[in-house]
Regions:
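Non-heme di-metal
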Residues: 1-205
């Protein structure tokens, strides 16, 4: 928790978001059906957690391979968070975002404390869940005839995000090289369960 507080303070000190950037995000917010807003609320919460997973990793790990991996993927997850946030009203976002930040930080920091392979096992578990999560939403949108331009734009965002998450999963699997042992498998099962619970909560709160 102390690492989390220090990292949070550093991020606040270095924040450089501009008013122009914020105006662009507001300009892109569109009117969407309630069910799609619910899906996007879970996506926004999930991408928030993903950003903080990498912050958690970077706050602990000194392994150069892990740090390069985390820094590169953090940039991608920040872009995902912005893109999804650009089509979801602030008032429709999960009210539990502080919880998702802390949960994400812990999910990244714990495996980084144990070892580099655990980081990659964790990312594989997270991205496997996210791949399936996005796929369901994309299929639902694909099933709608005469999709309006706003919803088509959302589908394009989800497809791009999903492609990135699949690439993250495959890269983590490749770098890990060895199959996880029993304890690592139990940890990954816990991460997957936590992801399912988070989606259910974010959809409602």
């Amino acid at each position: 928790m102390e690492n989390y507080r220090k990292y949070l303070g550093k991020l606040h000190a270095n924040r450089t978001e501009t008013s122009e950037h914020q105006s662009l995000a507001r300009a892109r917010i569109v009117i969407l059906p309630a069910w799609l807003e619910g899906d996007l609320r879970t996506d926004h919460a999930g991408e928030t957690g993903a950003v903080w997973i990498y912050h958690g990793i970077l706050s602990v790990s000194r392994n150069p391979i892990v740090r390069e991996f985390a820094q590169r993927h953090l940039k991608t997850e920040k872009r995902h968070l912005y893109e999804i946030g650009s089509v979801l009203k602030r008032t429709r976002r999960s009210r539990l975002l502080p919880v998702w930040r802390i949960a994400g930080f812990i999910t990244g920091a714990v495996p980084a404390l144990i070892g580099s392979r655990w980081v990659f096992y964790t990312i594989e578990a997270v991205e496997t869940f996210v791949d399936a999560h996005y796929e369901l939403q994309i299929r639902r949108l694909e099933a709608i005839r005469n999709l309006d331009p706003d919803m088509a734009a959302v589908r394009t965002i989800l497809e791009a995000c999903r492609a990135d998450e699949i690439a993250h999963r495959d890269e983590a699997l490749q770098i890990a090289t060895k199959r996880p042992g029993l304890l690592a498998r139990l940890w990954c099962a816990l991460v997957s369960l936590g992801s399912r619970i988070a989606v259910a909560c974010a959809r409602r709160i």
